[in-house]
Amino acid sequence: LAQALAQGVNAVYLDLHGAAVAEHADDAEGELLSRVRALIGENIPLVASLDLHANVTRRMLDVADALVAYRTYPHVDMAETGERAAQLLKRRMQLGRRQAVAAHRLPYLISLNAQSTWTPPAWTP
């Protein structure tokens, strides 16, 4: 990343999982995004894609310009998700400032066996 910065990188996109586990960090993706933000500064856009069942933390929301979730599980929409992330990066660069970031945590857990978007309850026609 330091090498890319020296060459004039103007945006950073990370394809993350959203539920990584690290021995010395309670919030692995939040830690990674924070470290990247510290390296690139506030003026370079930082966007990440995550699984639709990611554990999104306040820290992740605070340091990333946008977090983009896959809409399918299994993840067959990787290209579309990357395209949405690229559009957000482009918009952030055009605006020259960070947009509002919001999230709302729903009060339930869904079993992994029920998360497939190919079958009910997660599938919708």
Label the model's feature ranges.
Residues 1-2, 124:
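Short alpha-helical segments and helix-capping/turn motifs at coil-helix boundaries
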Residues 94-125:
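Accessory alpha-helical/coil subdomains and C-terminal extensions
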Residues 2-95:
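Active-site histidine-anchored catalytic micro-motif
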